[in-house]
């Protein structure tokens, strides 16, 4: 990130970053998915850091991705898939609890709207 920092110890580097208003936070991510038009890049057990530099947040992902064609159902707990509009049980429960409706009604509305927030808003 900073050129010529080979001689700095990590503590000194952190102190300098704090002086410049840069906060660095480790995120305990289990999986990171990057979706492009053609494929999904799935990082299992990736190292993720959040850098906040004066309000601008940047995420850094380090790891080996597995490439999947878009639309493969490799991950069971995706919040939604593009073709089927399938949602995880957690998503259905969240909508049902927030809107005060049954899970079947929540699932139908999720499939209809394709979005958690829109489903809750429609049901309220």
Curated annotation (Swiss-Prot):
Compositionally biased tracts (Acidic residues): 74-93
Keyword flag Electron transport: no
Keyword annotations of the record: Protein transport, RNA-binding, Transport
PROSITE patterns tied to this protein: NAC_AB
Pfam families xref list: NAC
Start and end residues of each stretch annotated as Disordered: 53-124
Domain of life of the native organism: Archaea
GO MF, one annotated term: RNA binding
Biological processes annotated in GO: protein transport
NAC-A/B domain sequence ranges: 7-74
Family: Belongs to the NAC-alpha family.
Biological function: Contacts the emerging nascent chain on the ribosome.
Cross-referenced HAMAP family: NAC_arch
UniProt subunit comment: Homodimer. Interacts with the ribosome. Binds ribosomal RNA.
Protein name, per record: Nascent polypeptide-associated complex protein
Species this protein is from: Natronomonas pharaonis (strain ATCC 35678 / DSM 2160 / CIP 103997 / JCM 8858 / NBRC 14720 / NCIMB 2260 / Gabara) (Halobacterium pharaonis)
The encoding gene: nac
């Amino acid at each position: 990130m900073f050129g010529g920092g080979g001689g700095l110890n990590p503590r000194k580097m952190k102190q300098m970053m704090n002086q410049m208003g840069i906060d660095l936070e480790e995120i305990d991510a289990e999986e990171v998915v990057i979706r492009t038009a053609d494929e999904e890049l799935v990082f299992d057990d990736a190292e993720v850091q959040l850098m906040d530099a004066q309000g601008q947040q940047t995420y850094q992902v380090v790891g080996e991705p597995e490439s999947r064609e878009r639309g493969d159902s490799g991950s069971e707990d995706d919040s939604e898939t593009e073709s089927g509009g399938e949602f995880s049980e957690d998503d259905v429960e969240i909508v049902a609890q927030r809107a005060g409706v049954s899970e079947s009604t929540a699932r139908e509305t999720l499939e209809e709207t394709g979005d958690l927030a829109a489903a809750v808003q429609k049901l309220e």
